[in-house]
Design a protein with these regions (language model features):
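Bacterial signal peptide processing site
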Residues: 22-24
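Bacterial N-terminal signal peptides that target proteins for export
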Residues: 1-9
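Flexible coil segments in periplasmic/lumen-exposed cytochrome c-class electron-transfer proteins
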Residues: 26, 44-45, 67, 120-158
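Electrostatic cytochrome c docking/interface patches
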Residues: 28-65, 157-158
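Extracytoplasmic electron-transfer domains, predominantly the class I c-type cytochrome c fold
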Residues: 89-143
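C-terminal motif of bacterial Sec signal peptides marking the signal peptidase cleavage site
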Residues: 18-20
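Short, flexible, mixed-charge acidic loops at enzyme active sites
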Residues: 37-41, 83-89
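Sequence/structural segment immediately N-terminal to covalent heme-attachment motifs in c-type
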Residues: 56-79, 86, 109
Length: 158
């Protein structure tokens, strides 16, 4: 395993643990570094075209995959509703309905899901999710429900 993969794996394993322990918001310095990093990564795939159309079946398939793999950090609605650590991570977990996220092309969204965003807590899913699952998640991201309209993840309500 390469050093980069080892470090990425360690960050992914430790990030949720540290997020749960964190009692204070990120410092101004942490937030500044995270913001700069987030906005200076190269997101590839701009011209890649999603082979899945926005049909009811494809949206439902994307929702199922999203719920299985993405809901823990992004909430049921993709807008962090009910996720207790979403704002305390550095950088905070973005709302997937935000203009910032929605301005990405479908191919760019797939690339982010494939490769993740280092050094944030966003893991890459290439090898875990199939291309079909990822493309269906992208379809779902284009059709997210209204914030808070589907409730909170049960795992955080206990």
């Amino acid at each position: 395993m390469s050093v980069r993969k080892t470090i990425s794996f360690a960050v992914l394993v430790c990030m949720p643990m540290f997020a749960g322990c964190r009692a204070t918001p990120s410092s101004k310095a942490e937030t500044s570094v995270a913001y700069w990093t987030k906005h200076h990564i190269t997101v590839r795939g701009k011209k890649d075209v999603n082979p899945y159309k926005a049909t009811e079946d494809n949206i439902a398939e994307g929702k199922d995959s999203f719920t299985s793999y993405c809901m823990v950090c992004h909430g049921l609605d993709g807008q962090n509703t009910g996720v207790p650590f979403a704002e305390t991570l550095s950088p905070p977990v973005p709302s997937l309905a935000s203009t910032e996220v929605q301005k990405y092309s479908d191919g760019q969204l797939k690339w982010v899901i494939d490769y993740g965003v280092w050094p944030s807590g966003m893991p890459g899913s290439k090898g875990t999710l199939s291309d079909e699952e990822i493309w269906s998640i992208v379809v779902y991201l284009r059709h997210l429900p209204a914030a808070g309209s589907v409730g909170e993840p049960e795992m955080y309500s206990h």
